[in-house]
Amino acid sequence: MNKFYLMIAYEVTKASDGENPEMKKLIREVAKNNPEIMERCEVFTADRGYDDTEIITDLWDEHKVKAVIDIRNCWQDKDEIRMFENRQNIIGYDNFGTIYCYCPESGKRREMSFSGFEKDRESLKYTCPCKAYGVQCEGCKTCPYANKSVRIKMEEDPRRFTAIARSSHKWNREYDIRTSVERVNSRIDNAYGFEKHYIRGKKKMKLRVGLSLLIMLVMALGRIKEKQPERMRSLVARVS
């Protein structure tokens, strides 16, 4: 699915089939059959049902596509903070990849400021809150990271440390776009009559779904040819 709410690839499966294996197959098929699409693609968004390290790493390593996928809370303590090794017990992170620092004097925890993604280093850069926000910290004189930045390599934990930081506003904006899939599913159910259907058998269902998506794409193409791109998703507006 793209930002225009139009289908790029699809598959009809049994309800018992796993989503992640099917998604991996679809990504490989698009990369093989339509490499120009993967070359233009910058961000891949999906809900936590597709939270999978292999999907995230393959998208970045093979195609340099940034995955924006919600993460499941797999830690027993949802408020747990894990400390990085070789960071002098000062820098830590939570299950969602948010980076924190601890004052070496008071032990107070503060969220560090995300300062950007360094593609060449495949690292996320975070800045000391004293420098970023001007906060007062008792341990500034003794903290080795005071008024400095730290880099977190993606490879340390690809699920949590993604190219678009999970704690950033950009991540939230991109994640909201995933609703395009839900809107297309809603259109298939309502406009194309799949919510109440009497189709039996996977082959028949695949044919009907394929025809519906084809109609959707053809109508969008017609709108574009008629210089009405703003109506490419409309099913009822007249082509003048």
Enumerate the predicted regions with their spans.
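Alpha-helix N-cap/loop-to-helix boundary motif
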Residues: 15, 132, 173-176
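Detector for glycine-centered tight turns/loop "hinges" at secondary-structure junctions
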Residues: 5, 95-98, 107, 124, ...
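Generic recognition of cysteine residues
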Residues: 41, 74, 101-103, 128-130, ...
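Short amphipathic alpha-helical "interface-anchor" segments enriched in bulky aromatics
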Residues: 81-118, 154-200
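Long, low-complexity, polar/charged, intrinsically disordered or flexibly structured peripheral segments
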Residues: 119-163
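Basic, amphipathic alpha-helical segments enriched in Lys/Arg and hydrophobic/aromatic residues
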Residues: 169-240
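Polybasic low-complexity intrinsically disordered regions
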Residues: 1-64, 68-75
